[in-house]
């Protein structure tokens, strides 16, 4: 660590505000859901409560039968269906109205989707059971007449979507998640045929979704992209450098498509990826951008294998489409005096983009509050370091030109399954984020710390809770988190 004189902050928080910060931002694991902060848990409970209120409200005559209840469950599912489509739009109306980006709003899409599933399960399951009791025929219970046939097929569509939306499938078989989600078309068709109220409920939401798809189509086709370099890096990562005139911020992500990778399927297969370059990177005045894709599924694995074998993958041959950029870090890192960037595995991509951007601004003399940057990267072994070895070495070399008495650039790489000899950069084992945050707090004395973290859910939860534990009256630790999957 370089020695620098970083002035202490005179800020002082009240005990109440510190505890509110700790409680409101603490992370929990909720069975059936991804890890979430306490504030998200409150929103989830409010959402569930609101749905239960509409399900269980007293009926007009004060008397409700089982049939009344299950039919009301269908209407609650319809009400949620009105929101599930606009909540999945990337060019979201919610960004315009309340400033919440797609990656934050998508969790509400998942919640409404699951609520639709549970309400249809209550509605359809009860009717199927009643029909089976009356006929003792499974086929008649499921497909006995048009009402049962269309209802069963609509429910089957939802079952497929819910199963393939699991976080494990989104991460390791993104194409299965991507393609299975198009069964929502059958959900709409059979839903309309099943109930006359379905179309009025979902018409507006579907209209917003269609508009979003048109915007994405235009954005991804209107600007040409030139692939400058495609490079397979060991342990299954493909580095793609491309040229495109666009504005973006460090830490943003996009969706990429390589139409001629494996046509015809690749014509419509998109994959989410964080931009690993900084907005300022240029080569002779030409804006260059970089993405790193880890071979975790069919699409990314094929890209890596073809790049490694040089099978029709020269930069001039590979075509690329780009939908984005999207998202925005919840913290303005350039406005924070002390910044810690934590990443696990390929989750380093948005964090190294932020690191590059901060160092570029420090070197260029642009207005910047950041004086201390702590970069923590957790990877299995030294081979994974090759993903960004040249970038980190180049960054550290450039940062050496900064005055030691003003700036700190501290890089630590933790190897969890390697016997590499520890050095000033490499360390064996998993880090204690609580210890690292305590060390930074002790060194700087007072003032807020901005933490960015991207990696596995377990890591994000640990970092968040360590940040809350180290928040006190002399400085709060604020966290911006990103996950692997959308």
Short names for language-model regions:
Residues 170, 175, 179, 183-187, ...:
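Membrane-proximal cytosolic interface modules of multi-pass membrane proteins
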Residues 2-27, 228-245, 253:
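Non-transmembrane, juxtamembrane loop and terminal tail segments
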Residues 228-317, 379-380, 416:
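Ferredoxin-reductase
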Residues 275, 348-366, 390:
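Histidine-anchored nucleotide/phosphate-binding helix
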Residues 200, 285, 291, 296-315, ...:
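Reductase modules of NAD(P)H-dependent flavoproteins
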């Amino acid at each position: 660590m370089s020695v620098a004189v970083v002035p202490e902050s005179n800020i002082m928080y009240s005990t109440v505000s510190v505890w509110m910060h700790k409680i409101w931002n603490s992370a929990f694991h909720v069975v059936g859901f991804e890890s979430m902060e306490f504030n998200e848990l409150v929103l989830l409970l409010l959402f569930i409560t609101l749905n239960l209120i509409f399900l269980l409200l007293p009926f007009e005559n004060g008397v409700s039968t089982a049939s009344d209840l299950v039919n009301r469950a269908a209407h609650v599912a319809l009400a949620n269906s009105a929101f599930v489509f606009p909540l999945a739009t990337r060019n979201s109306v919610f960004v315009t109205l309340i400033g919440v980006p797609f990656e934050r709003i998508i969790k509400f899409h998942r919640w409404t989707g699951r609520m639709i599933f549970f309400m249809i399960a209550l509605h359809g399951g009860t009717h199927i059971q009643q029909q089976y009791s009356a006929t003792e025929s499974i086929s008649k219970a499921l497909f006995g007449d048009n009402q049962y046939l269309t209802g069963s097929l609509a429910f089957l569509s939802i079952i497929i979507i819910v199963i393939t939306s699991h976080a494990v499938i989104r991460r390791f078989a993104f194409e299965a998640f991507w393609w299975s989600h198009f069964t929502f078309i059958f959900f709409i068709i059979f839903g309309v045929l099943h109930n006359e109220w379905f179309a009025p409920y979902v018409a507006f939401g579907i209209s917003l979704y269609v508009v979003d798809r048109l915007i994405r189509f235009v954005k991804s086709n209107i600007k040409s992209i030139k692939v400058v370099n495609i490079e397979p890096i060991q342990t299954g990562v493909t580095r793609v450098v491309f040229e495109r005139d666009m504005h973006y911020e460090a830490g943003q992500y996009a969706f990429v498509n390589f139409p001629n990778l494996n046509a015809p399927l690749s014509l419509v297969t998109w994959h989410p990826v964080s931009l690993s370059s900084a907005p300022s990177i240029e080569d002779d005045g030409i804006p260059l951008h970089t993405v790193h894709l880890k071979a975790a599924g069919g699409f990314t694995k094929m890209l890596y294998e073809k790049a490694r074998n040089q099978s029709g993958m020269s930069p001039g041959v590979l075509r690329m489409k780009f939908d984005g950029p999207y998202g925005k870090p919840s913290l303005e890192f350039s406005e924070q005096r002390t910044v810690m960037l934590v990443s696990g595995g390929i989750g380093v991509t948005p964090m190294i983009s932020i690191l590059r951007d901060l160092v570029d601004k420090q070197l260029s003399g642009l207005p910047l509050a950041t004086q201390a940057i702590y970069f923590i990267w957790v990877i299995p072994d030294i081979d994974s370091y090759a993903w960004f070895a040249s970038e980190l070495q180049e960054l550290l070399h450039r940062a050496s030109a900064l005055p030691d008495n003003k700036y700190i650039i501290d890089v630590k790489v933790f190897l969890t399954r390697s016997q590499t000899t520890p050095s000033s950069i490499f360390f064996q084992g998993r880090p204690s984020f609580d210890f690292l945050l305590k060390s930074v707090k002790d060194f700087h004395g007072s003032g807020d710390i901005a933490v960015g973290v991207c990696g596995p859910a377990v890591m994000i939860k640990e970092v968040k809770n360590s940040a809350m534990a180290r928040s006190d009256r002399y400085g709060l630790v604020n966290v911006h988190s990103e996950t692997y999957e959308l």
